[in-house]
């Protein structure tokens, strides 16, 4: 049963990871292209367009999505996303300009150069769009790195657990064979068992803590469901009496 439940779980995690990789590549490519258009000089744009690896990855990803979904579907999706992103960026840009104007007036009233100090808040819609794309790409990449590190740590935990067991068995056999005195052998075996128990406790505390958290959350959900059922059951007799 555990294997049957764990296989779909791993497949779902793998599917999420693949989708997030595609989304991250798309966002990084879009943000890179937008930042080149917005912040780079024309000569630098020509040089970086041909040599940028993100541009090549973005083109390959676009060709792959065109093959999967079709060029017309991809065109509609990209146009819709661009319009939504531009509307959000324009609204944020207007808010930034309004905030910079208010801050400039307040700073000027204090005798400071408000226009110069608030120049960084005056962001155009294209600059806001670039920042949003890079921020979304950073969040997706952070999620991917967290997932990858969790998988690596889980694998290392399994490897260290097996290595710990092998070392314990080897130490146990060596003690039984090499120590002739029963009292000394018992003390050394007790020390070995204590060390093994401490290592098991230290290495298993994090995983057991996560399992306990999951169990507590499951119990909390069950309690909330029971409370909801009790409330609905208590309301039903009242409604019947009123009728």
UniProtKB/Swiss-Prot annotation:
Q: Does the keyword Signal apply?
A: yes
**Which InterPro entries has this protein been placed in?**
TMEM109
The record describes its membrane topology as: Multi-pass membrane protein
The residues on the Lumenal side of the membrane are 34-83, 157-185
One Pfam family, please name it. BRI3BP
Q: Reaction catalysed? A: K(+)(in) = K(+)(out); Ca(2+)(in) = Ca(2+)(out)
Its main localization is nucleus
Q: Looking at the UniProt record for this protein, which Gene Ontology cellular component terms does it annotate, in alphabetical order?
A: endoplasmic reticulum; monoatomic ion channel complex; nuclear membrane; nuclear outer membrane; sarcoplasmic reticulum membrane
Tell me where it resides: Nucleus outer membrane; Endoplasmic reticulum membrane; Sarcoplasmic reticulum membrane
Among the GO molecular function terms of this UniProt record, one is:
voltage-gated monoatomic cation channel activity
- Disulfide cross-links: none
> Can the keyword Protein biosynthesis be found in this entry's annotation?
no
Q: What does this protein do?
A: Functions as a voltage-gated monoatomic cation channel permeable to both potassium and calcium. Plays a role in the cellular response to DNA damage.
Oligomeric state and partners? Homooligomer. Interacts with CRYAB; in the cellular response to DNA damage.
This protein is called what?
Voltage-gated monoatomic cation channel TMEM109
Annotated organism of origin? Mus musculus (Mouse)
